[in-house]
Every structure is written in C-alpha cells, then in structure tokens.
C-alpha cells in the first residue's frame, strides 16, 4: 500500500516542479557606515511598504543600468542614501514576494555593499517606510531571510578584519 502512495507523492512533486516559475531577479544594497566617534559598523534597514518587515533596499532590474547601479539607485529612492557601491556582489538570498494581486513570486536577490557618505533630506519614498541605522547584530536579528543574515554576518567579519589590518599598520 505504501508503494502507490510513494508514486503519487513523486508525481505530485514532479507536477509542482513543472509549473514552478524560475525566480525573478532583484538587486539590493547592503548600506553601511562606520561611526566616526566609536568606529562602530552600522547597517541601514528599512521597513517594507506592504508587510512592515525589516529589509534592505532592493528592486527590479532597470534598462540601461548595471546590477550594482540598480542597487545604488534603490538605496537612494527607498532610503535617501548615496555612497560608493561595490561592483562585485556580496552574495544572494531568496525570498517570496507577494504581489498586489496576492500571487507569490520567488525572487533571487543579489546584494551589493554600499558605503554611505550622503543622506538626502528629500527622496522618492520618504515617509513611506521606517528607516533605521542599527548594529550588525541587531540587523541579523531583524531580517527574516537566513541567507541575508549570513551575508550580513560575513560582511561584518570582512569589515572587522579590514579594521584590524588598518590598526596593525
């Protein structure tokens, strides 16, 4: 009796795989700054407009823009920050975006580090989100996506090593 159930389970799984859409690509900025007085590394988090969960600025590809340029543009539009964006991604994470019609779309997000050096008073989505600077440990607690937590942790370790090397000179 278990054999027919196993076959049915396999068929159901195969059908799901056939109809699953490939993930849609997005680009994000892991915005950071180093406090001048304390030397503390801080991350910028903001709330999503739909669910209010803590996220980093991200968006869809834009015609004529490279992926890291899209990440920087989204950081400005969503949080009003400008800075120097790295051209190589730190990594990627996955999540399911719920569209306005309720459909869930799997997304794969490439993340680029952005060293913030300017905060704008006016920007496109001002007032639509809560924006906060937090420690790396707080950022890891607030974001939901495990892969994004790993990216933040790895970035913190990279920056800590960079600070230690600079102090050793």
Annotate each language-model stretch with its function.
Residues 35-42, 101-104:
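Short, solvent-exposed loop/turn segments that connect beta-strands within catalytic domains
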Residues 1-36:
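Acidic, metal-coordinating catalytic segment for phosphate/diphosphate chemistry
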């Amino acid at each position: 009796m278990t054999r027919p159930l196993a076959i049915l389970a396999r068929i159901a799984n195969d059908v799901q795989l056939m109809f699953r859409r490939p993930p849609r690509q997005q680009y994000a900025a892991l915005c950071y700054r180093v406090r001048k007085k304390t030397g503390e590394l801080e991350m910028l988090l903001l709330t999503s407009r739909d669910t209010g969960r803590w996220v980093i600025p991200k968006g869809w590809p834009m015609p004529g823009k490279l992926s890291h340029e899209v990440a920087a543009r989204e950081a400005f539009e969503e949080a009003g920050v400008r800075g120097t964006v790295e051209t190589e991604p730190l990594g990627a994470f996955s999540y399911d975006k719920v569209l306005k019609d309720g459909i869930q779309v799997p997304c794969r997000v490439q993340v680029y580090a952005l060293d913030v050096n300017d905060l704008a008073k006016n920007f496109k989505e001002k007032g639509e989100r809560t924006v906060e600077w937090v420690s790396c440990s707080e950022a890891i607690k607030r974001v939901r996506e495990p892969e994004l937590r790993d990216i933040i942790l790895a970035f913190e370790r990279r920056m800590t090593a960079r600070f230690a090397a600079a102090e050793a000179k």
